[in-house]
Design a protein with these regions (language model features):
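Cysteine-nucleophile amide-bond enzymes
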Residues: 1-171
Length: 171
């Protein structure tokens, strides 16, 4: 499915997930992600939050070296495909304070150690982030707590949202 045709279905508050299924390793990053996917036996290697910035769809995400706001179209150009995880219910981004909360984390550090640790245990609350932990924290402020009993991996986030009725569409 072409992103340009599907784009209209993506709304603020939705989650995107990527798999990063590179057949050829172009960088050290490609190799690291492939190793993580193999060890965790996960389909998903990354998650982020969709927000609107005027007419643009942007993604709030925790990546090396910090939490950032990044155009979804750039992610599409870089990874080729992604999964759209539409929320099965309306999320109040502004009234709940979730949007301000997420924006307040922009520029904070990404923790590669936390990303590795998240496979085995729940993460402690600190000022360093990994992608799934960031999405979970945002959703909790928005009134959707998916932290109970799950670890902070991209796959855990996607599966928890699917249990609540979210879809998962390959774009």
């Amino acid at each position: 499915m072409k992103y340009s045709d599907y784009r209209k279905n993506i709304k603020a508050g939705d989650v995107i997930a990527t798999s990063h299924r590179a057949k050829w390793y172009k960088s050290w990053y490609d190799l690291k992600i492939s190793v993580v996917r193999a060890v965790t036996q996960s389909e998903y290697s990354h998650v982020g939050l969709v927000v609107n910035w005027g007419e643009r769809l942007m993604v709030l995400e925790a990546v090396e070296p910090f939490v950032r706001i990044y155009p979804l179209s750039n992610i599409v150009n870089e990874v080729g495909e992604f999964y759209h995880v539409p929320m099965p219910f309306k999320i109040d981004l502004t009234g709940s304070g979730a949007f301000d909360y997420a924006l307040g984390k922009v520029g904070q550090s990404y923790s590669q150690i936390d990303a590795m640790r998240s496979v085995f245990t729940r993460l402690k609350d600190d000022a360093k982030w990994e992608c799934a932990e960031y999405v979970q924290a945002f959703l909790k402020v928005a009134g959707v707590d998916i932290t109970d009993g799950i670890k902070s991996t991209p796959t855990d986030v996607v599966l928890a949202l699917m249990r609540l009725g979210a879809g998962c569409i390959l774009v």
